[in-house]
């Protein structure tokens, strides 16, 4: 798909090398080139160790790249530091896999969401308090959540609170790094639906990172497939089955199909067992009626 707009984020030949003991090195990222366009959701999929989380940490400046460029709105932000970096982090937010690791256990949820609003001088006082309640409602949490501590929330509720904090500063880009993988399937689906809704409403660009191809395909416009630190293929989500050419992408697709087939088989067996149970119950009821008569 051709894009008429300029990319909001561009990674040019991004490399990240880790130095290990014994003068050994590991190339976590190898000349990665990717573009993210305004309003787009770019999925990044790959197995553990493929480099996808390293990529997210480099984009958000939690890690320094070894070489290459990170360009935001056509400006090189690769080596930002100090106040400039702090301001840049407002524009590129990140939602991690484990929300519990982000919270201060002694800070209530309301204060947690309000904190960046105050720190970035977006609003203050009563206005910030009202904004917290609005954000909670937007992610499907009640107003009473503001007075709760992190340990009083479920994993899904914690992730919703983290998302509320991230969208509160009105960033241009949000990175979701395995943001639903620690949740059970039903809660995961609710969070994915929330992300789709928020994207439609706000127009925020996003990068959704996961090892699960089916999940990535559900929320993304395009999918970048990473393998051993490289982007081996970028395909349109809607054309994945017909356009994917790389053997690794094909293997991911095959594993997704096998998992789906297994789920369908388990579901069919469950339904069959329930039907048999109902039939047995009906027989018991008929027998009881005949005996009582």
Language model: regions and residue ranges:
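Conserved ABC ATPase signature
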Residues: 149-153, 157
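Helix-to-loop junction immediately C-terminal to a conserved catalytic motif
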Residues: 60
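Conserved ABC transporter NBD signature motif
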Residues: 68-76
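Conserved ABC ATPase "signature" region
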Residues: 76, 127-144, 253-254
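Short catalytic/signature loops enriched in Gly
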Residues: 2-7, 25, 234-276, 280-293
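ABC ATPase NBD coupling module
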Residues: 21-23, 77-93, 119, 239-244
